[in-house]
Amino acid sequence: MTKVLFLCTANSARSLMAEAIFRQFAGDDFEVASAGTEPTKPEPGALAALEHLGVETDGLHSKALADIDLNSFDYVISLCDRARTECQALCGDQHFIAWDFPDPVTSKKADAFKKTAHELSERIKMLLLILRKKSDRPQLFDAPHEFFKIMADPLRLKMILMLQHHGELCVCQF
């Protein structure tokens, strides 16, 4: 079973919401947890935003990263720059993914928690789609060379030339 861990600093809003949303959408197909580098109690606004989305909040509580074995997770997803900086080096063979979401706790906007919960739910839906497809075809794009193997020669050559010229490419630039 694939195991996913969501991280942020306090484990009181973003990562806690991500854990609950992922659990609801994934069902029994995945195991999910969340933790914080400096955990505090769950934010009432986060719990209210989850309930607004119809996501179950029973049993949600903040957990310390120190109490979790990072090596037991297949995917570790940080939800803030600080957690990414502190935790990326600690991750061994797992896939480390960095999602930077603004902290709704420090936001002045009235709907910050609802907006964050909605954005997390959309991102998690996409992640689950990818993870489920990958489990159907586990060898699909595990490494860049696998991706290049399926390209036609002219496209492969064009991509290599673009990489050489630009050094780094992002789809948002095209």
Question: Could you describe each region identified by the protein language model?
Answer:
Residues 1-66:
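Conserved active-site segments centered on acidic
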Residues 12, 81-84:
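Short glycine-rich anion-binding loops that position phosphate/pyrophosphate groups of nucleotides
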Residues 142-174:
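N-terminal helix-turn-helix DNA-binding core of bacterial DNA-binding proteins
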Residues 70-72:
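Alpha-helix C-terminal capping/helix-to-coil transition sites in glycosyltransferase folds
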Residues 136-140:
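Long, low-complexity, charged/polar intrinsically disordered regions in eukaryotic proteins
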Residues 78:
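Redox-cofactor binding/interface segments in oxidoreductases and associated redox assembly factors
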